[in-house]
Amino acid sequence: MQLKAKEELLRNMELGLIPDQEIRQLIRVELEKRLQWGYKETHEEQLSQLLDLVHSLKGMKMATEMENLDLKLYEAPMEFLKIQHGSNMKQSAGYYTDESTTLDEAEIAMLDLYMERAQIKDGQSVLDLGCGLGAVALFGANKFKKCQFTGVTSSVEQKDYIEGKCKELKLTNVKVLLADITTYETEERFDRIFAVELIEHMKNYQLLLKKISEWMKDDGLLFVEHVCHKTLAYHYEPVDAEDWYTNYIFPAGTLTLSSASMLLYFQDDVSVVNQWTLSGKHYSRSHEEWLKNMDKNIVEFKEIMRSITKTEKEAIKLLNFWRIFCMCGAELFGYKNGEEWMLTHLLFKKK
């Protein structure tokens, strides 16, 4: 596919000229190419590939290219996010116990699972790094009234939303700090720390975990959730010149996808207590539910897009960007029945 043809494909997708099933098939083609690129003939080669990336990350800054993250993803209108997500406004995977589980139920089930695996108990001090719209902090603070939750976000809109929800829910045990995690410093020490889908935009996990360990009490625990591939780890960069998919959502340099085992190579300042993996089917289904929510409310969705863009064409492109985002996530995490790309949970203690 020549550059001109790739640009035309993306333009037609964003204008809604390509059917969903065709887009999904194009995504699956790119996913298969990624696996062909990543899987090696011998275990020796496979391990060498992983360790090469581990060693290179240890020589990098904590995070790079953060300023290039697409604002469409991280500064989306609150009215839109309320349409897309469930009642807990969880911007990551839900936990689906069976086929009848709703999006709201899946959000609650996953948040309950976080609390259980992080061993949250009343009276603890809890830090939520990269707290997003506060799903973890708000849920935890409502369930554990004697805990004090501190959320850290770099988004003014997210901070305002969480503080508004605290007033609505009459929660006095949540505070939100506006800060960049890579430069954030505090003298406070916490019983528990959450890092849910934070490391994906980091590079040097060694520096990150060292920094986090300094905020942990001696008997504190760190709970991490991150998306992963079961074997492969790689920077999110195109496989070849024809790859339209890789940098469509995440610009080059802004995302590194870890393997399920990758953080085990970064135990200088923390040591793993436990690890779990969750089938990619959970995240795939969350993306499908988000897409359904958008399509069920398409008229309202279009009006929101029109309110933040200058032209009708830009509104259509933004609408289809979000639809394609959901299809990309659904296909990635659903690929091969959720047994390639998935989620992992890790619990660390301080060394």
Swiss-Prot record:
The record's SUPFAM superfamilies line, in alphabetical order, gives: S-adenosyl-L-methionine-dependent methyltransferases (SSF53335)
The compartments listed are: Cytoplasm
Tell me, using the record's free text, what induces this protein.
Up-regulated upon fungal elicitor treatment or wounding.
* Highest taxon above the source species: Eukaryota
**What Enzyme Commission number(s) appear in the record?**
2.1.1.140
Q: Which InterPro entries match?
A: SAM-dependent_MTases_sf
What stretches pass through the bilayer?
Answer: none
Q: What is its main location?
A: cytoplasm
Reactions mediated catalytically: (S)-coclaurine + S-adenosyl-L-methionine = (S)-N-methylcoclaurine + S-adenosyl-L-homocysteine + H(+)
For this UniProt entry, the molecular function terms from Gene Ontology, in alphabetical order, are: (S)-coclaurine-N-methyltransferase activity
Can you cite a GO biological process for this protein? (S)-reticuline biosynthetic process
Please give the pathway this protein is involved in: Alkaloid biosynthesis; (S)-reticuline biosynthesis; (S)-reticuline from (S)-norcoclaurine: step 2/4
Which residues are the active-site ones? C326
Q: In which tissues is it expressed?
A: Expressed in roots, stems, flower buds and at lower levels, in leaves. Restricted to sieve elements of the phloem adjacent or proximal to laticifers.
Question: Which Gene Ontology cellular-component terms appear in the entry?
Answer: cytoplasm
Binding residues for S-adenosyl-L-methionine: 91-92, 126-134, 153-158
Query: What sort of enzyme, by top EC class, is this?
Result: transferase
One of its Pfam families is: CMAS
The UniProt keywords, alphabetically, are: Alkaloid metabolism, Cytoplasm, Methyltransferase, S-adenosyl-L-methionine, Transferase
> Of which family is this protein a member?
Belongs to the CFA/CMAS family.
Give the protein's biological function. Involved in the biosynthesis of benzylisoquinoline alkaloids. N-methyltransferase methylating (S)-coclaurine. 4'-O-methylcoclaurine and norlaudanine can also be used as substrates.
**What is the name listed in the Swiss-Prot or TrEMBL entry for this protein?**
(S)-coclaurine N-methyltransferase
Organism of provenance:
Papaver somniferum
Gene encoding this chain? CNMT
